[in-house]
Curated annotation (Swiss-Prot):
The gene is MT-CYB. GO terms for cellular component: mitochondrial inner membrane; respiratory chain complex III. Its cofactor is heme b. The keyword Manganese does not apply. Heme b b562 binds at residues 83, 182. It comes from Ommatophoca rossii. Pfam families: Cytochrom_B_C, Cytochrome_B. Belongs to the cytochrome b family. This is Cytochrome b. Heme b b566 binds at residues 97, 196.
Length: 379
């Protein structure tokens, strides 16, 4: 009798994706982040579901419903903080995952890469709308500032913003629709993640050497299931340390003040994981220019496969490109720091230089360096 996991229509899909999947024998811990993102997504959907049972999406009661969750609901505080800090862990894993893709040339799987970019945008939209829901000062003003950026679009901008708001300012209609979208988008993300995996399994995984590994594949289970469990335990340990010891470390104190349209906070800033893009937005004095730079800071990932000029896939054997990659990482950390600083000297100049460097590395320096490295190989 054939094994049921290989014949049953549903079990067969799971078997071919997580059990008998032929996997390169040399993939490192950098390949753990895909499964960690899956765990983050499941965790966010579950905690979010329980929060939605007690949350009310009305401007008069939203803030107090969060207070009610934290004070009166059994273990409501831990669910709330797991959800808030779970988002931070989600983005840490996301950026690591994208960084791995850039470093090891995984972007040459263009379908998988492009679905990944769509996933990134969808998750960013979900996180932004989730941040608006507690209806604190930073929620309200963050929503006002970011949605207002769309008014920079010529001709239709103002109408578009008012259409999104459902009125002439961020109000009850905005909060209600943001809650609706915040609830539905994680399921869209789940579907996109399945498509992401579907495309990946068409080609098989990349590996650190960048060399085809068809001659040396091992089954996913038990080797990588054990490895993924280790990664998951470390992820949950980090998350719980954050939740139980300093749950507000990554949040903004202003969000503990109920939203007040008549009082603007001194420094409006998004959550830490959007600060790099926010810094790029602020570094351009023109509104439309800033919005375009903001969009391009992520969209630039879509043209990375076109800019690949190297004869080698990954950066494992390309030391000059490695230096550039780590310069890019340092630059993104600098942008993240600048995004959280007030708009004054010297932060403005540092932000502008870091923004220029970000685009220069990706569009100019990396392709040129790859060509130089190709020529070095000939000597």
């Amino acid at each position: 009798m054939t094994n049921i996991r290989k014949t049953h229509p549903l079990a067969k899909i799971i078997n071919n994706s997580f059990i008998d999947l032929p996997t390169p024998s040399n993939i490192s811990a950098w390949w753990n982040f895909g499964s960690l993102l899956g765990i983050c997504l499941i965790l966010q959907i579950l905690t979010g579901l329980f929060l939605a049972m007690h949350y009310t999406s009305d401007t008069t009661t939203a803030f107090s419903s969060i207070t009610h969750i934290c004070r009166d609901v059994n273990y409501g505080w831990i669910i709330r903080y797991m959800h808030a800090n779970g988002a931070s862990m989600f983005f840490i894993c996301l950026y690591m995952h994208v960084g791995r893709g850039l470093y090891y040339g995984s972007y040459t799987f263009t379908e998988t890469w492009n679905i990944g970019i769509i996933l990134l945008f969808t998750i960013m939209a979900t996180a932004f709308m989730g941040y608006v829901l507690p209806w604190g000062q930073m929620s309200f003003w963050g929503a006002t500032v970011i949605t207002n950026l769309l008014s920079a679009i010529p001709y239709i901008g103002t109408d578009l913003v008012q259409w999104i708001w459902g009125g002439f300012s961020v109000d009850k209609a905005t909060l209600t629709r943001f809650f609706a979208f915040h609830f539905i988008l994680p399921f869209v993300v789940s579907a996109l993640a399945a498509v992401h995996l579907l495309f990946l399994h068409e080609t098989g995984s990349n590996n650190p050497s960048g060399i085809p590994s068809n001659s040396d594949k091992i089954p996913f289970h038990p080797y990588y299931t054990i490895k993924d469990i280790l990664g998951a335990l470390l992820l949950i340990l980090t998350l719980m340390l954050l939740v139980l010891f300093s749950p507000d470390l990554l949040g903004d104190p202003d969000n503990y003040t109920p939203a007040n349209p008549l009082s603007t906070p001194p420094h409006i800033k998004p959550e830490w994981y959007f600060l790099f893009a926010y810094a790029i937005l602020r570094s351009i004095p023109n509104k439309l220019g800033g919005v375009l730079a903001l969009a391009l800071s992520i969209l630039i990932l879509a043209i990375i496969p076109l800019l690949h000029t190297s004869k080698q896939r990954g950066m494992m054997f390309r030391p000059i490109s490695q230096c550039l990659f780590w310069l890019l990482v340092a630059d993104l950390l600098t942008l993240t720091w600048i995004g959280g600083q007030p708009v004054e000297h010297p932060y403005i100049t540092i932000g502008q230089l870091a923004s220029i460097l970000y685009f220069t590395i990706l569009l100019v320096l990396m392709p040129i360096t790859s060509i130089i490295e190709n020529n070095i190989l000939k000597w």
